[in-house]
C-alpha cells in the first residue's frame, strides 16, 4: 500500500570544481523535476529514496550516501493518488527532501522519464517547475558552495 508521504531526491556530481545537478523530464507531465516518489508499505523515507533512485535511474545507492535536507513541503493528496487514499481527513502529505552525490553517472532512464540532463544551478532553477524543487535545490547549493 502507498505510504502517506512523498520523497524528492537531488542527484548531483562534482566535476572540475563545478557542481551539476541531474534533472528529469517526465513522460506523464511536461515538467522537469528531480527523482521523486512515494513510500510503499512500511518503508522509511530513506528506503524509499534508495528504491526510487534504482527504479528511475537504475543506480544502486547505499543508505549511507543519502543526505537529508531541511527543506520540506506538503502536497495535496489528490495531486499524488487522485483520490483520498488515507481517509477523508488526510488532505496533504509531507514531502521530504534528500541529496546524493553520484560517483557513477551511468543513468539508465525508466519509462517514467523521457530524458535527463546534467545542468548547473542556474539552468536547473530555470527549468524546474515546482517551488519545492527550487527550494530544495537552493538549500543544497548553499550547503555545497
Where are these regions (language model features)?
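Short aromatic/basic micro-patch
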Residues: 33, 92, 118
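Active-site segment of metal-dependent pyrophosphate-handling enzymes
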Residues: 59-104
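C-terminal alpha-helix
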Residues: 139-144
Amino acid at each position: 500500500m502507498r505510504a502517506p508521504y512523498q520523497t524528492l531526491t537531488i542527484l548531483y556530481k562534482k566535476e572540475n570544481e563545478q557542481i551539476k545537478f541531474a534533472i528529469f523530464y517526465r513522460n506523464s507531465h511536461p515538467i522537469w523535476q528531480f527523482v521523486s516518489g512515494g513510500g510503499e508499505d512500511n518503508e522509511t523515507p530513506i528506503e524509499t529514496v534508495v528504491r526510487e533512485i534504482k527504479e528511475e535511474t537504475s543506480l544502486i545507492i547505499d543508505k549511507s550516501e543519502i543526505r537529508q535536507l531541511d527543506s520540506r513541503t506538503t502536497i495535496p493528496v489528490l495531486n499524488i493518488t487522485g483520490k483520498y487514499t488515507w481517509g477523508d481527513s488526510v488532505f496533504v502529505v509531507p514531502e521530504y527532501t534528500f541529496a546524493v552525490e553520484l560517483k557513477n553517472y551511468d543513468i539508465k532512464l525508466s519509462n517514467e522519464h523521457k530524458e535527463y540532463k546534467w545542468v548547473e544551478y542556474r539552468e536547473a532553477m530555470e527549468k524546474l517547475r515546482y517551488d519545492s524543487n527550487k527550494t530544495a535545490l537552493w538549500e543544497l547549493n548553499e550547503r555545497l558552495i
